């Protein structure tokens, strides 16, 4: 049998500022915090924080995901972030407020939602 390789301990990086990407869809919210180069420091989603099904799309689930990602980033020494928001979901504003409430200083908020110049046909309207 092959001998298992020993892995070194995870190195704690000291990254004072970074970028938070909030991808908010109708079904889920994903928060990714990177360093200025774009290397991921921490991430969390509504699904990874324990929500299932339709509850993943709620603002409260987005808040919990943002808090979880921010806590991990602050353990790596992060203090300032720029926020890039993408998507039409319910958790956009709530996730930004949650990042602010954890003690991270937000220096910039930018909406990077892609807008089509009449691209794909949108899904048909729901009839309930």
Swiss-Prot record:
GO terms for molecular function: rRNA binding; structural constituent of ribosome. The keyword Nucleotidyltransferase does not apply. GO terms for biological process: translation. The keyword Ribonucleoprotein applies. InterPro entries: Ribosomal_uS11 (IPR001971), Ribosomal_uS11_bac-type (IPR019981), Ribosomal_uS11_CS (IPR018102), Ribosomal_uS11_sf (IPR036967). GO terms for cellular component: ribonucleoprotein complex; ribosome. It comes from the Bacteria. Keywords: Ribonucleoprotein, Ribosomal protein, RNA-binding, rRNA-binding. PROSITE patterns: RIBOSOMAL_S11. Gene3D superfamilies: Ribosomal protein S11. It holds the Pfam family Ribosomal_S11. PANTHER family: 40S RIBOSOMAL PROTEIN S14/30S RIBOSOMAL PROTEIN S11. Located on the platform of the 30S subunit, it bridges several disparate RNA helices of the 16S rRNA. Forms part of the Shine-Dalgarno cleft in the 70S ribosome. NCBIfam families: PRK05309.1, uS11_bact. Part of the 30S ribosomal subunit. Interacts with proteins S7 and S18. Binds to IF-3. HAMAP family: Ribosomal_uS11 (MF_01310). Belongs to the universal ribosomal protein uS11 family. This is Small ribosomal subunit protein uS11. The gene is rpsK.
């Amino acid at each position: 049998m092959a001998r298992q390789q020993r892995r070194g301990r995870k190195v704690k990086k000291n990254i004072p500022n970074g970028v938070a990407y909030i991808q908010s869809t109708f079904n889920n919210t994903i928060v990714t915090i990177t360093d200025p180069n774009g290397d991921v420091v921490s991430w969390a989603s509504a699904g990874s924080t324990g929500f299932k099904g339709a509850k993943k799309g709620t603002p409260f689930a987005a808040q919990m995901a943002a808090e979880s990602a921010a806590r991990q980033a602050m353990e790596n020494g992060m203090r300032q972030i720029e926020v890039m928001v993408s998507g039409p979901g319910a958790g956009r504003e709530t996730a930004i407020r949650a990042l602010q409430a954890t003690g991270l200083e937000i220096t910039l908020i930018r909406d990077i939602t892609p807008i089509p110049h009449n691209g794909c046909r949108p899904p048909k309207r729901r009839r309930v």
